[in-house]
Amino acid sequence: MDNPFKFGSIVEGPYFTDRSRERAILRQVLDSPNHAVLISPRRYGKSSLVVETLRDVKRDVIAVNMQAVTSSTKLAEALYRKFFTLHPLEKARHFLSGVRIVPTVSFNPVSGAPEVSFVPDSDRQVILEDAFNVLENSGGKKRLIVVFDEFPEILQLEKGLDKILRSIMQEHKNINYILMGSQEEMMKKNFLRKKSPFYHFGVPIHLDKIPAPDFRDYIVQRLPSTLQEESRCHIADDILAFTDCHPYYTQQLAFQVWFELQQTGNVSGIVESAISHIVQSHDFDYSRLWESMNKTNRMVLMKLIDEDTPPMENSEIPASTIFSALKRLVSSGILIKKGKYRYDDPFFKKWVLQLRNI
């Protein structure tokens, strides 16, 4: 039997759990002329939610990861490539009739994938406007769905690009945009701050942790049926107590627990054994991460092991310095702030605890 838990890639089909509320909201947005903005911490399953929702939507989809884009022209090239993948060149010609700067299109002789380029020094804003408007013209009654992952990366490309994109995208009636990113604070800054060009651009959909009862049922149903239900429930509770219902880390720990159960059949201490295995397997990565940090960051992380101890208290380091360290740690994804500061990765927290106790 295959391991029924999955992490590290898109989770869909039988591996996908819950999110019925968020799926319903996203589907409602896609059935309207509006746009969706997905906001959550890293590894909460935004991409999986989108993929799972789009499985039932019979419409064309273009998806671009902004981390792979290095300029506005490269963004236009990516959009054209996706467009020509959906529409063969001969059939797509009439959508290009209004294009002011015509792209050079060729096809990879091995893969057949479209390749797009422009004459050097062409007007970048015109190129970008043309690319977006080609997508708009190809929409029609069945609106095109355009997904931008890691959307805040646009701020790193060119100054003022966010204003240009907003001016283009707000005119479109034949496209539903889905904008998302793993930098929660940046997403909030881009879409919830009044001064941002994308303020109120779309319907905000916040992804929180999966409710414990739902996640518990999901785990219990997938643990080996040879175990008594009481044992499966106890194991599920121990998993969720450690991961605090974080979607990614729960799947990761459940995967390892299931694997070890298949190997040994020993239920006693199975969750702690799986935790130890995962922490040990990431020792090199955690060590490199720790070595890259300055003294203040390390001190803050050590103090946060005891979650009841505010990192600002009882410290010889100025509060302003600690606050700056907290901001850095949140920005890098090591910490998350939900009321108070917490570790994002419970396995890294366990590693730091072991380091402190040496």
Q: Where are the regions a protein language model picked out?
A:
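Accessory beta->alpha helical hairpin/"wing" motif in late/C-terminal subdomains of nucleic-acid enzymes
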Residues: K338-K350
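Conserved Walker B catalytic segment
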Residues: S117-E184, L192
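A short, basic N-terminal segment
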Residues: M1-A36, P41, L89, I358
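Winged-helix-like regulatory helical subdomains adjacent to P-loop NTPase cores
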Residues: C245, Q251-A319
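Short, amphipathic alpha-helical interaction segments positioned at domain boundaries
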Residues: F348-I358
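P-loop NTPase nucleotide-binding core
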Residues: S32-H35, I39-Y44, S48-L144
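Helix-loop-helix "sensor" segment of P-loop NTPases
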Residues: K189-A241, Q263-G265
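Short amphipathic alpha-helical interaction segments
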Residues: E316-S332, R342
